[in-house]
Amino acid sequence: MADLEEQLSDEEKVRIAAKFIIHAPPGEFNEVFNDVRLLLNNDNLLREGAAHAFAQYNLDQFTPVKIEGYEDQVLITEHGDLGNGKFLDPKNRICFKFDHLRKEATDPRPYEAENAVESWRTSVETALRAYVKEHYPNGVCTVYGKKIDGQQTIIACIESHQFQAKNFWNGRWRSEWKFTITPSTTQVVGILKIQVHYYEDGNVQLVSHKDIQDSLTVSNEVQTAKEFIKIVEAAENEYQTAISENYQTMSDTTFKALRRQLPVTRTKIDWNKILSYKIGKEMQNA
């Protein structure tokens, strides 16, 4: 082991540490970070070399953050990344600094949004917040409006998590939806992601995603937002149902094919009455 450590360069050590951090399960960033810190045993090297991994983790996980003085949380995503550690809160029209290690937002300041698409963004956000409130007990959403390749584009992100460390499981739902504002009809593109980690008496992870495409009729802002939410709701309901049914099927068929739940005799052994069994008598006479 000592020879292996001598062979690894600092660059290689940091690369391995960063990989562990980026793939930390939902709600377990601190635990993974602390373990990696002990293994690396060099705080300066970890901070300088793996800082990009801290940022990538928060961007990938749609990490929600509360900004002091503002009611609603905002998601940390690539769509709100303004560079130099600053992020956009489109609802409140502010930008703020974000510490990727501490997961804290500071220094909120006014920020002018894309005026040309703001009315569309606001309509979609209003409809999406109502939907998230109805379907996600701990849900947070952020809606962006921006020009991409000259086209006015709406990007809607949803995050919801349950961290139950005392019960040995954590999970997170993420979904991202995007469409351009074009006359008559447009294409909606979405991706849905679920990640769950269960680690009591074992280590089981569910990592699943699904890509969605659908067409959306574009009329006025309010009606378009309503039609967009119908697409989101139908797709996310179908995905959740499919995941649940798939695991029920696995429980009923696949797992049973791997291992018998009961012995060949189809009866469970009553260990309290083991001495009444023939094998128990033989054991007693032995």
Swiss-Prot record:
PANTHER family: F-ACTIN-CAPPING PROTEIN SUBUNIT ALPHA, F-ACTIN-CAPPING PROTEIN SUBUNIT ALPHA-2. GO terms for biological process: actin cytoskeleton organization; barbed-end actin filament capping. Belongs to the F-actin-capping protein alpha subunit family. Gene3D superfamilies: F-actin capping protein, alpha subunit, F-actin capping protein, beta subunit. This is F-actin-capping protein subunit alpha-2. Component of the F-actin capping complex, composed of a heterodimer of an alpha and a beta subunit. Component of the WASH complex, composed of F-actin-capping protein subunit alpha (CAPZA1, CAPZA2 or CAPZA3), F-actin-capping protein subunit beta (CAPZB), WASHC1, WASHC2, WASHC3, WASHC4 and WASHC5. Interacts with RCSD1/CAPZIP. Directly interacts with CRACD; this interaction decreases binding to actin. GO terms for cellular component: cortical cytoskeleton; F-actin capping protein complex. It comes from Felis catus (Cat). PROSITE patterns: F_ACTIN_CAPPING_A_1 (PS00748), F_ACTIN_CAPPING_A_2 (PS00749). InterPro entries: CapZ_alpha, CapZ_alpha/beta, CapZ_alpha/beta_2, CapZ_alpha_1, F-actin_cap_asu_CS. It comes from the Eukaryota. Transmembrane segments: none annotated.
